[in-house]
Curated annotation (Swiss-Prot):
Coiled coil: none annotated. Core subunit of respiratory chain NADH dehydrogenase (Complex I) which is composed of 45 different subunits. It catalyses: a ubiquinone + NADH + 5 H(+)(in) = a ubiquinol + NAD(+) + 4 H(+)(out). The chain crosses the membrane at residues 3-23, 43-63. This is NADH-ubiquinone oxidoreductase chain 5. The gene is MT-ND5. It is found in: Mitochondrion inner membrane. GO terms for biological process: mitochondrial electron transport, NADH to ubiquinone; mitochondrial respiratory chain complex I assembly. It is an enzyme of class 7 (translocase). One of its GO terms (cellular component) is mitochondrial inner membrane. One of its GO terms (molecular function) is NADH dehydrogenase (ubiquinone) activity. Belongs to the complex I subunit 5 family.
Length: 79
């Protein structure tokens, strides 16, 4: 993985953690809104790295293709 992919995955992980925390007792404390705010702020700061890399290279788009599964003769792809 390169820096672009790992930074995006880290940002998405930071955004998903408040949803996962709702299954624990930390969700019921008064510090939970601050935790969510800090998590979103960290995800934003982390997402600046791939955005600046994208702008610096003067790319206009990114094409990604993911082969999900094959059912008999039909290929399911996500792009």
């Amino acid at each position: 993985m390169n820096l672009f992919s790992s930074s995006i995955l880290l940002s998405l992980t930071l955004l998903i953690t408040p949803f996962i925390i709702t299954t624990t007792k930390k969700y019921e404390t008064h510090a939970y809104p601050y935790y969510v705010k800090n998590s979103i702020a960290c995800a934003f700061m982390t997402s600046l790295v791939p955005m600046l890399m994208f702008l610096y290279t003067n790319q206009e788009m990114i094409i990604s293709n993911w082969h999900w599964m094959t059912i008999h003769t039909m290929k399911l792809c996500l792009s």
